[in-house]
């Protein structure tokens, strides 16, 4: 599979200690969208910390974090009911691709392969993520 852009898939939640990472996700999007990075927020209640209505999530993100990167609808990210992208990531990259908590990050390169995964505590603007992005953009 070949895709034009690189994608950072992040499972998000409104009521999590990591929710403040929305700020850095927006910063990352602003810095790299013209270079071919898509930041894709995937709201999920898999860890029971997300609102129940998609429009409320969108409003929360816009009002509190002024985000304008794409958000999906509420999606399961683990287990049997996980969305296909998370099942695919697990099959192609192993257990490290399975979110263990909110704000888990999966970086997909332009060849459509999992480039790397990052745990919740890895901030979007961390050197670890920035260095990897700089190498693949």
What do the PLM-derived regions correspond to, one by one?
Residues 55-102:
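Short, internal strand/loop/helix patches
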Residues 36-38, 49-59:
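Short, surface-exposed acidic-centric catalytic microdomains
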Residues 1-5:
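Conserved small/polar residues in nucleotide/adenosyl-binding loops
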Residues 21-24, 53, 57, 81, ...:
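Stable alpha-helical elements in mature extracytoplasmic
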Residues 14-16, 43-49, 75-78, 120:
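Short histidine/acidic/glycine/proline-rich micro-motifs that form metal-
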Residues 87, 91-137:
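Thiol-/selenol-based redox modules, centered on thioredoxin-like
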Residues 6, 15, 19-43, 62-65:
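Conserved helix-turn-beta segment immediately C-terminal to the redox Cys motif
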